[in-house]
Amino acid sequence: MLILTRRCAESLIIGDGEITVTVLGVKGNQVRIGVNAPKEVAVHREEIYLRIKKEKDEEPSH
């Protein structure tokens, strides 16, 4: 795992610059981040992604 330190308004770039993650603010133990990615790239919070994956796994296969 790559660990980076960023301040408010600083960003990191993923891949060839198509995905940008920006720190928007820090308040207590919460960090607000913004993700700029192409429409074809799904961006989810981890708990939402896991719920979607679980629902797909539970679908009957034909």
Swiss-Prot record:
It is found in: Cytoplasm. Its main location: cytoplasm. InterPro entries: CsrA, CsrA_sf. Induction: Active throughout the cell cycle. Expressed during exponential and stationary phases; more protein expressed in stationary phase (at protein level). Under partial control of the GacA/GacS two-component regulatory system. Keywords: Activator, Cytoplasm, Repressor, RNA-binding, Translation regulation. It comes from the Bacteria. One of its GO terms (biological process) is positive regulation of translational initiation. One of its GO terms (molecular function) is mRNA 5'-UTR binding. Transmembrane segments: none annotated. GO terms for cellular component: cytosol. PANTHER family: CARBON STORAGE REGULATOR. A translational regulator that binds mRNA to regulate translation initiation and/or mRNA stability. Post-transcriptionally represses the expression of genes controlled by GacA/GacS. Represses expression of hcnA; alterations in the ribosome-binding site relieve the repression. Binds specifically to small RNAs (sRNA) RsmX, RsmZ and RsmY; these sRNAs fold into secondary structures with multiple GGA sequence in loops to which the CsrA proteins bind. Homodimer; the beta-strands of each monomer intercalate to form a hydrophobic core, while the alpha-helices form wings that extend away from the core. HAMAP family: CsrA. This is Translational regulator CsrA2. It comes from Pseudomonas protegens (strain DSM 19095 / LMG 27888 / CFBP 6595 / CHA0). The lineage of its organism: Bacteria, Pseudomonadati, Pseudomonadota, Gammaproteobacteria, Pseudomonadales. The gene is csrA2.
